[in-house]
Amino acid sequence: MSAPHDFIAIGLGPFNLGLACLTEPIDELDGLFLDDKPSFDWHPGMMLETSTLQVPFMADLVTLADPTSPFSFLNYLKEAGRMYSFYIRESFYPLRAEYNDYCRWAAAKLASIRFGHQVTTVEYDESEQVYVVHADHLPTGEKKTYRARKIVLGTGTPPHIPEACQGLGGDFLHNADYLENKAALQAKDSITIVGSGQSAAEIYHDLLQDIDSHGYHLTWATRSPRFFPLEYTKLTLEMTSPEYVDYFHALPAATRDRLNASHKNLYKGINSELINEIFDLLYQKNLHGPCPTRLLTNTALVEAAYDPASATYTLGLRQEEQGQDFTHATQGLILATGYRYTTPRFLAPLTDRIAWDDAGRYAVARNYSIDTAGRDIFVQNAELHTHGFVTPDLGMAAYRNSCIIRELLGREYYPVEKSIAFQEFAAPAGPHHPVEVSPV
């Protein structure tokens, strides 16, 4: 039997791919990366031609941990012969399709990645003190078994379907499947988008451009009271920092949950330029008469029904501020309702080794571990409730990976920043004395 790997990473989105790139030059670490997809593919249903990342190119797989890495976005541009074109373009923000191609380029250089491997079970062997990972090799159906001392989970967040649409018939779809169904949607008489974030805005803008040539009626319903822009001011961006994560993680769970609810416009808002482009396009479309489109704010989806005979959805909506219910009929239905983490079924044998909070979520330690010992199982993008809104941020991925690598190695390999912000988030340390008020 071969020696166990130092770690096995399960799932290969940008976060674990960054870990693969950053551990590649570390001879002391033997890692294996397993993913069920046939190749790297990041949100293929939202690869709109003009869509860009919402973070600058420096938030690539490696640069903020190791600017000299051969896996940097700039090195990708150089090898692709587009360095000067990107420079002349004068935008810090890569196209989303370009970022996906960059990730594919990086993945192709790594021998530690195994695509087409669907993990079925992870167990712990007490006698050998290793994790045993069972996987199906999808192209051949062969059963595979791997062993490792530590596990890193990067299985991503699946599309969230609201309760009102659970079990709903017809051909409604989540925005994750938008592009492959776009032509079929545009053949319908009416299309409705439900959701409030960047994906909903991008799809609305995309469909609004073609509304004249296809003749459909287009509706966008959002529960938010307005179309919130993504807050991107510099002092706010300092909250994507190690010290804010320190501060947030130390807060009581109830406070963290309350803050996360109030932080949605920090990571779920809409690019302000896109909001303005939508308004300008609406202005153009209304020059020669009313454009067949509606924008509904403060509008929650309460229930939904599907009539196969007419291929029509009837949505039960509620205007939240007025408390008034109404219905809306549509043939096409797109749910831009986000993604939510679910615990992978393959972890069931490890339930007793994992630390859980009172709400049944991972009790994620500051070092991103979830096992009760705090040193064996680590998570990527599953710690929103413990580490805050920076969890899905590509810009903090290299920092998190540097922290995880420090735990895997037992020492710091990439310098881990501890303080980068000008502002202070917590009260000063040390004894605090009440202010003495002198009598007047």
Task: Mark where each language-model region is.
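Flavin (primarily FAD) cofactor-binding/catalytic cores of flavoenzymes
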Residues: 1-38, 42-44, 86-198, 202-440
